[in-house]
Amino acid sequence: MTTQEFTGRTALVTGAASGIGLAVATMLAGRGAKVAVADFRLDAAREAVAALEAIGAEALAVQVDVTDPASVEAAVRTTVQGLGPLSLAVNNAGIGGAVAPTGGYDPQDWRRVLATNLDGVFYSMRYELPEILAAGGGAIVNMSSILGTNGFAGSPAYVAAKHGVVGLTKSTALEYAGQGVRVNAVGPGFVDTPLLKDADPAARAALIALHPAGRLGRAEEVAELTAFLLSERASFITGSYHLVDGGYSAR
């Protein structure tokens, strides 16, 4: 039974104003959670909250810059003050970054991608974990990618960051497994989000062709796996990396 499995629990979702993050926030709210919609774009976060409130959910818009530890700390504090003890977190905020080979990759672009996609996950867990422990335990899902275990030419920073997320997830899970906190990572394939909707048709077709399922993923499919990992149905699952990729990694 999944209908209201998160009733009474507070969840913080970063990058939650659109795409996968919004799908996760919507699913958790629909199953009873109080959700902090955390995003760099406060106006977009407020729009998402309005949509959640329209379906009867309790939600809070929180502005956060995951590259700034002080901003992340403040976002976690605001969440707890506004919605109550934190027991669930989804660290989803991320960017794609520039496309270039390693030998020609701009160091500033490298730092920008790592700061968001890897440092941001560390900062998020750094400030979420004390609150989750104080709440008596809970679960975290970090959004990695199929590129968390595979290479992809032209995306060295993104691939390195997403590999790092998988490693960080495993280490953190070991540290907190005996304290009632589970930590897992999700590895989506290419998902039909706003980031890809404006892609060149040929490039989009090439991405679709990478998936034996013959299509891009849907944000709701990633949200479904994420919600499962956060739930008590996954009570013996921690420290692992879970694919939702239409067969991409099976090739």
What is each residue range found by the language model?
Residues 100-102, 106-114, 196, 207:
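Substrate-binding pocket helix/loop in short-chain dehydrogenase/reductase
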Residues 130, 174-178, 235:
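Alpha-helical segment proximal to the catalytic Tyr-Lys
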Residues 2, 96-99, 150, 210, ...:
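Short C-terminal tail/terminal secondary-structure segment
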Residues 4-36:
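Canonical Rossmann dinucleotide-binding motif of NAD(H)/NADP(H)-dependent dehydrogenases/reductases
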